[in-house]
Every structure is written in structure tokens, then in C-alpha cells.
Amino acid sequence: MFTRSRWLVSAGALGSVCALLAGCGSTGSGTAGGASPAAARSAGASPSTGAAQPAGGSPSGTVASPSAGPDKFTAPLTVNNPMFPLAVGTQFTYQGKIVEGGESKPHSVTFTVTDLSKMVDGVQTVVAWDRDFLEGELQEQELAFFAQDDQGNVWNFGEYPEEYDGGKFTGAPSTWIRGADGAYGGIHMLSQPRTGMKYREGLVPAIEFDDVSTVTRTGQQTCLAGTCYKQVLVVDETSPNDPTSGHQIKYYSPPTGLIQVGARGGDSQEFLTLTSVRHLGQAEMAKIRTEVKAMDQRAYKIKVYRTTKPAERRV
């Protein structure tokens, strides 16, 4: 629910994003942050991105990505971006519906910030647990990995989404991990979003994951179920390679984070509203930790996941 399947940065917005992220690679043979190709290679980075990615440079047909090597994450587990804060033990619940083929079905999502971390591509990441229910039945549960860089931008480092049918686990074919099998991580939330900015959320050619986000509005006020939120940020997510997916419209408000999800176009539309924010106690966290660790172990059946270390409890 929180990360879709798309990616591209417009040349017009790239300069602004690069300024925020302390340097970008140039299209083609350039390097991130002004580093030489040799220096980038010695750091284990792609010459075109500056990030610790598979060799071979940026994917064909895309512009260069903002720099995001491990050296830019000195406190990656401190995710305090006001538009997407990830405090340990926080659980967000969203209620809404899925509309498909003219039919509407009840839909809900719980998103929990666990007390676990996971090393991904040289960076310690926050492990979040996302559970997606349709008509009360579990459809998908996902481990998502996030880290905040030194500029305050929150990055996607990978996902392990388990799919279910009739309550039975059917597989996790959309798993991706930054730096494995040609996968590139991307930005989940900018530190200083401004109207018109476009940014990548992730690019994984192997599973056709290709997310593009555009900041469409800032400083808005949105009222939901009697609660009014100020300084609301509106982001449009879409997939250039999949026109049938339409657009997902997300609303963020500080210091809460995501408060609403809407849709425009597409064969299947998701609508969600934040209904509760809880801070879980030790007993609940212990139970969640057990379930998430079990998922983490199951994930090692997938080749790209084996590039990571097992999730561990944060100190």
C-alpha cells in the first residue's frame, strides 16, 4: 500500500532534488556528487548514481538518480521526517475501500513500525510491517525497509510482500532488495518537498517495479472525520510503464505522516483514511516481533533476499 511499482525523475526537477540530496550523477558517464568514476567504483557505487548499486550504471532510458551511498546515512534508523515519521511501536490503521469493475469492497491496512532493523546494501534500515485486508481477509502482508539520510530524506530499500488467497500464503513474487539483481532504491519522502518536484521511489526491472512521485500541492488543509490537518502535502504516484494502474494520490501532514489515500483513473482504485494512531505496549511489540522474524526467515527462500542479514532487535 505504501509503495507502488514505478519510477522516473524529470530533468527539470532533477536539479532541485540534487541540491537537497548533496549531489547527483549526470546522465550518461557522469558521477554522483562530482566524484570520479574510479572513486565511485572503489566505494561500491554505480558511477551514475553514487549509490551502492549493481555494476553497470543507471538503467537504460532513465536519467541519473540522486546520490545515496552508505556514507550518507550516519543515523539511518532515526526516521523523524515530519511527513513520514517512523517511531518504534507506532501503529497506523487505515479504513476505506477498493473499487474495481464498478464494485466496492471494504479495505483496511495496518502499518506498524517494529523494533527490528535490517542491514540492506550497507545501510541499517527500519523494518515496517504492513498488513492489507480486503473484506476482513488478509490479502497481503509486507516487510518494508526504510532509512533516513543525513539530509532528512526517507529512502525505500526494499520490500518482501507475501500474497494470500483464502487465508493461505501463495508466494512473494514482488520481492526486491536494493543492490540485488539490478534493483535501485528510491526516495519515499523528501526532506523539503516543493510543488513540482518529481522523484523516484524505486526501480526494479526484474519485477517491473517503476514508481514516479510528483509533489502536486503543499501547505493545504484537509479535514477527515472531524479532524482537520494543516500543512498537508499532496503527492501523486503513478507508473509510466503501466497506464492501467492509474494514479494514487497520497496526503501527508506533519507530524503524523500519511493521513489519506485517494485514486484517479486505473482499473482498480484504493481509497483509505487514517482512523487511528496507537503506540503499542511491550506485550504487543513482542508478539509482532515474533511474527515479523518468522516472515524474515521465510523470505530467505528468495534469492535476492539472501543478500541481506537477518532482522535484529534494535538496541
Which residues are covered by each model-predicted region?
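C-terminal motif of bacterial Sec signal peptides marking the signal peptidase cleavage site
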Residues: A19-G23
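Bacterial N-terminal signal peptides that target proteins for export
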Residues: M1-L14
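Conserved functional acidic sites
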Residues: G25-G28, G33-P37, G44, G50, ...
